[in-house]
Amino acid sequence: MGQTVTTPLSLTLGHWKDVERIAHNQSVDVKKRRWVTFCSAEWPTFNVGWPRDGTFNRDLITQVKIKVFSPGPHGHPDQVPYIVTWEALAFDPPPWVKPFVHPKPPPPLPPSAPSLPLEPPLSTPPRSSLYPALTPSLGAKPKPQVLSDSGGPLIDLLTEDPPPYRDPRPPPSDRDGNGGEATPAGEAPDPSPMASRLRGRREPPVADSTTSQAFPLRTGGNGQLQYWPFSSSDL
């Protein structure tokens, strides 16, 4: 005796009472003959990979549902109760459907970024004890000197003695043209005693810049004290 092959379509037909109950829970009604027609003849023409013996693959059921719910003339509103019942059997399977439900594939891993090639380590440039030669630029101008170079040595006014100066007075000659003793330049002849006494009375003595003199005080006409350059005893 040969064994019959169980398919998703034959499995639903063998548990038709459960299929009607699940459809009722979705608020729809299904008929057995139209169930077979849509599963084996209509949905395979949607070109989404639906097999004639039916499937519990959730991705294929979702693709057929999109075709059925398409708006306009491309939709199939008469097939809505049947694809909704197939979806309920796959997403909330009863015990007799679980062995045929395809396990949900794991989510695809995100594409990993291509690994970049490792950069070779930077080699340390060899050190050299030689320094580059500094060449003067052609367009560089010489810096002006603060003091002009006169060829003579500079004198440090703080640490060195000043140079000797030439005496402006001419050297005295031994004798004048008359054969007598020449009087040194800048020296006046000695005055006579009588002239010195008369000059002392007429001219006031020259005040020395290094000494100070005190003059007597006299009361003026307005009652203020004034300095008098001489006293009555000097007369």
UniProtKB/Swiss-Prot annotation:
- Disulfide feature: none
GO-annotated biological processes: viral budding via host ESCRT complex
User: Which is one Pfam family of this protein?
Assistant: Gag_MA
Keywords in alphabetical order, please. Capsid protein, Host-virus interaction, Lipoprotein, Myristate, Viral budding, Viral budding via the host ESCRT complexes, Viral release from host cell, Virion
**InterPro entries in the cross-refs:** G_retro_matrix, G_retro_matrix_sf, Gag_p12, Retroviral_Gag-Pol_poly, Retrovr_matrix
Tell me the first and last residues of the signal peptide.
none
Q: Where is this region: Disordered?
A: 108-235
Compositional bias annotation for Basic and acidic residues: 163-178
Fill in the PTM field for this protein.
Answer: Specific enzymatic cleavages in vivo yield mature proteins.
A GO cellular-component term linked to this record: viral capsid
Q: Where is the lipid attached (N-myristoyl glycine)?
A: 2
Q: Which parts of the sequence form the motif PPPY motif?
A: 162-165
Motif PPXY motif: positions? 162-165
Q: Pro residues compositional bias: what residue ranges?
A: 108-124
Cite any additional comment in the entry: This protein is synthesized as a Gag-Abl polyprotein.
- Function (record text): Matrix protein p15 targets Gag and gag-pol polyproteins to the plasma membrane via a multipartite membrane binding signal, that includes its myristoylated N-terminus. Also mediates nuclear localization of the preintegration complex. Capsid protein p30 forms the spherical core of the virus that encapsulates the genomic RNA-nucleocapsid complex.
Q: What is known of its domains?
A: Late-budding domains (L domains) are short sequence motifs essential for viral particle budding. They recruit proteins of the host ESCRT machinery (Endosomal Sorting Complex Required for Transport) or ESCRT-associated proteins. Gag-p12 contains one L domain: a PPXY motif which potentially interacts with the WW domain 3 of NEDD4 E3 ubiquitin ligase (Potential).
- PANTHER family from the xrefs? GAG_P30 DOMAIN-CONTAINING PROTEIN
Q: What is this protein called?
A: Gag polyprotein
List the source organism.
Abelson murine leukemia virus
Name the lineage: Viruses, Riboviria, Pararnavirae, Artverviricota, Revtraviricetes
